Regions:
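Conserved beta-alpha-beta core of the PfkB/ribokinase-like small-molecule kinase fold
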Residues: 1-50, 70-72
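Conserved phosphate-binding/catalytic region of the ribokinase-like
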Residues: 15-20, 45-149
Length: 149
């Protein structure tokens, strides 16, 4: 109505009226949350692609499934691809808040007019860096840290 993009990160997963999927521009579950909504186990790359297509059939315009150390999957009616996880310079310390880091960074990327894929790459990088630190909010990197990583 007002040309605003909608992003729903369903964490934690809760029942959603399926007709509301069509209202979403971006739906960003992780693997576990995607399994909750589709009632299917998602383990292989092919399972992920099938899940993505199922969400599109439900009306989601753009599906993003975060895959932790395996990266992220994206699909819409025109394209489908995987983005590898960031090759970390440091050990993973704590994954708390990584999904929040991803979603916040993705929204920032879109707000700064990045193309979808570039916003996903940026978000993936932010989430990866956040796992190398303890905590949730305290683990979020600055723009400078992301650009220098």
């Amino acid at each position: 109505e007002n040309n605003c993009l909608t992003i729903l990160n369903p964490a934690p997963a809760r029942k959603i009226n399926e007709e509301n999927f069509a209202l979403l521009d971006f739906f960003t579950p992780n693997e576990t949350e995607a399994e909750f909504y589709l009632k299917n186990k998602i383990t292989t790359e092919e399972d992920i692609k099938i899940a993505g297509r199922e969400f599109l059939k439900k009306g989601v315009k753009n599906i993003i499934i975060t895959l932790g150390e395996r990266g992220v999957y994206f699909a819409n009616e025109n394209e489908e691809y995987f983005i590898d996880a960031l090759k970390l310079k440091d050990q993973v310390v704590d994954t708390t808040g990584a999904g929040d880091a991803f979603n916040g960074a993705f929204a920032v990327g879109l707000a700064n007019d990045l193309k979808f894929k570039d916003a996903l790459i940026f978000a993936n990088k932010v989430a990866g860096i956040s796992t190398t630190r303890a905590g949730a909010a305290s683990s979020m990197p600055t723009f400078k840290e992301v650009n220098n990583y």
